[in-house]
């Protein structure tokens, strides 16, 4: 156990572990500063944004299945969203892990609903379940998702955003073709494309209504 006495010691610990990571990576023959698979997502995201600039809107994706609460994207089928997840998890094998990519509005309710889904999946399939909010996970575990041995089963959770803010085209300008919600959607799509390109198994569940209610329905169905 490391005892932290003040804010400065916290900074010292961060530096120590950054150095430890670099030293360990050196002896493992790994470049700790290389992130080729993070760049793969950025490349796809830039292409999505460029297409948005040209079209004036994000290109539509056709869902595989449409339910009252959610739309499902991916090569999958099922009678309910919970059934979709069960069918998706039939691919699971020893040594795999599940990853929830959460592109939802963070809140205490959302955290609890996502955590309930994580616990149910971990118990039912006896596999580790990673969970991260997008887009912030992209620069950390996002590298692992596309650069590992391909053991992940990815469930991406998205929603529409009622409140939005424009992103100015350049500093000091009011003109904007991009909003923060569109940027977030582009990042989710870009990572999904990068994962698919890398041969990873992924489905997307897009909540048309309250995602917390949708997650609770899935958990109850599982």
Predicted regions and their residues:
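Phosphate-moiety recognition in structured ligand-binding domains
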Residues: 1-222
């Amino acid at each position: 156990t490391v005892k932290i006495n003040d804010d400065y010691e916290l900074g010292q610990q961060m530096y120590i572990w950054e150095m430890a990571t670099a030293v360990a990576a050196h002896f493992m023959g790994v470049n700790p500063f290389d992130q080729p698979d993070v760049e793969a997502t950025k490349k796809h995201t830039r292409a999505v944004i460029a297409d948005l600039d040209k079209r004036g809107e994000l290109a539509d994706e056709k869902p595989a299945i449409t339910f009252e609460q959610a739309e499902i994207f991916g090569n999958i089928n099922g009678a309910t969203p919970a059934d979709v997840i069960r069918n998706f998890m039939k691919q699971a094998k020893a040594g795999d892990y599940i990853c929830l990519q959460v592109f939802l509005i963070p809140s205490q309710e959302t955290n609890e609903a996502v955590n309930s889904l994580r616990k149910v999946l971990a118990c039912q399939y006896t596999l580790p379940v990673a969970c991260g909010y997008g887009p912030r996970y992209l620069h950390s575990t996002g590298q692992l998702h596309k650069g590992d041995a391909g053991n992940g089963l990815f469930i991406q959770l998205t929603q529409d955003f009622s409140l939005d803010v424009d992103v100015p085209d350049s500093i000091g300008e009011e003109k904007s073709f991009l909003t923060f919600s569109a940027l977030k959607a582009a990042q989710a799509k870009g990572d999904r494309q990068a994962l698919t390109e890398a041969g990873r198994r992924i489905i997307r569940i897009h909540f048309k209504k309250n995602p917390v209610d949708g997650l609770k329905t899935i958990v109850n169905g599982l």
